[in-house]
Amino acid sequence: MSDNFYDVLGVSRDASEEEIKKAYRKQAAEHHPDVSDDDDAEERFKAIQKAKEVLTDEQKRQQYDQLGHDRFTEADKRGATGGGGPGGAGGPFGGAGGAGGAGGFEDIFNQFFGGGGGRGGGGGNRPRQGQDLRTGLTIDLEEAFEGATKEVTLTRPTQCDTCDGAGHPPDADVETCSQCNGRGQVQQVQQTPLGRVQQTSTCPRCEGSGELYSEDCADCGGDGVVREEATLSVEIPAGIRSGQSLRMEREGAPGENGGPNGDLLIEVDVDVGDRFERDGDDLRVNEAVSFPQAVFGDTIEVETVDGSVEMDVPTGTQSGETFRLKGKGMPRLRRRGRGDLYVKVGVVIPDSLNEEQREALEAFAEAGGEDVDVGGGFFKKLKSSF
């Protein structure tokens, strides 16, 4: 597999962001370690994630195209790529975000390739996608088995309707920022490992807009966003496991300068309950059988997630033996077939016997040539043998 990020996702160099995301979803679904049986599935999935991370970030993609794969990767290892996320959050490679712009190597790249962050670490007034948001959702085993439609409620940032995200009333007085002279960026000389360079960064006074307004929006306080409660309907695919996440596109934080919303990532927790244990797509369950059933063999009913099935208990079954019911486990996520159900048998030894049962077991012991103390030791011995 080629290391080139475009080749990893199978897209051309002029692919749009939507084409890249579509290719990522296809590759991720095919090569996720929980889905693929390939030995290198985990490493390949990491490469797919990395390729998507870089190529869907406008600034990182520009750096990648300018530097090439090898030089970009080396710069990445030194923490020299990427920028801060919206709202001042640090980028995935350690670049600082926030209204003051990024620092270090990111500023060098900005100087070389035309950077300068806008509000919240953006790039001038270019449209920027909003942050991805995360939340959790708990479902039961039956819902994970069948798939379900669930509702998730969260409080999230959304564009302020009062000012349409501008952060100020439409009739507010506006003046050109005197610190950057309306450019939204300021320049300064910084000492770096490459020597003294002139860097361009976001104007700290106007946060990259180049303008100052006489008053802020009363509802959002100038941020352009407010926090609201939202209830969303999410489709749960059959076979999902605890720890896996579902992505709802464009349900995240609002973008900047007309950019699209981020995505909402929903981490699923599957409550298996008390009866079953889950191991990937397989299930495990304990079933009790009587002493005569274990000795003579029998057919018993075993409850599965989707109903009961018959299972043969062979003659002479020992307590602790495990039997496999093929295809009676969980559905394989986005693949055909199901896992297996493993049934561990436990032989139940009676605590007390009536006279007829006692005589029968005494005869059983004598027929086997066992010299036992029927008054108490025999049954203790019998229990301990199971």
From Swiss-Prot:
Ranges where the J domain occurs: 4-68
Keywords annotated in UniProt: Chaperone, Cytoplasm, DNA replication, Metal-binding, Repeat, Stress response, Zinc, Zinc-finger
Keyword Cytoplasm in annotation: yes
Q: Where is the composition biased (Gly residues)?
A: 80-104, 113-125
Put simply, this protein is called Chaperone protein DnaJ
ZnF locations on chain (CR-type): 147-229
Please provide the record's free-text comment about the domains of this protein: The J domain is necessary and sufficient to stimulate DnaK ATPase activity. Zinc center 1 plays an important role in the autonomous, DnaK-independent chaperone activity of DnaJ. Zinc center 2 is essential for interaction with DnaK and for DnaJ activity.
**Phylogenetic lineage:** Archaea, Methanobacteriati, Methanobacteriota, Stenosarchaea group, Halobacteria
Q: Any idea where this protein resides?
A: Cytoplasm
Please list where the region (Disordered) is annotated: 22-132
Binding positions (Zn(2+) 1): 160, 163, 217, 220
Q: How is the cofactor bound?
A: Binds 2 Zn(2+) ions per monomer.
Q: Name one GO cellular component term.
A: cytoplasm
The residue ranges flagged as biased composition, category Basic and acidic residues, are 22-35, 43-79
Gene Ontology terms: biological process? chaperone cofactor-dependent protein refolding; DNA replication; protein refolding; response to heat
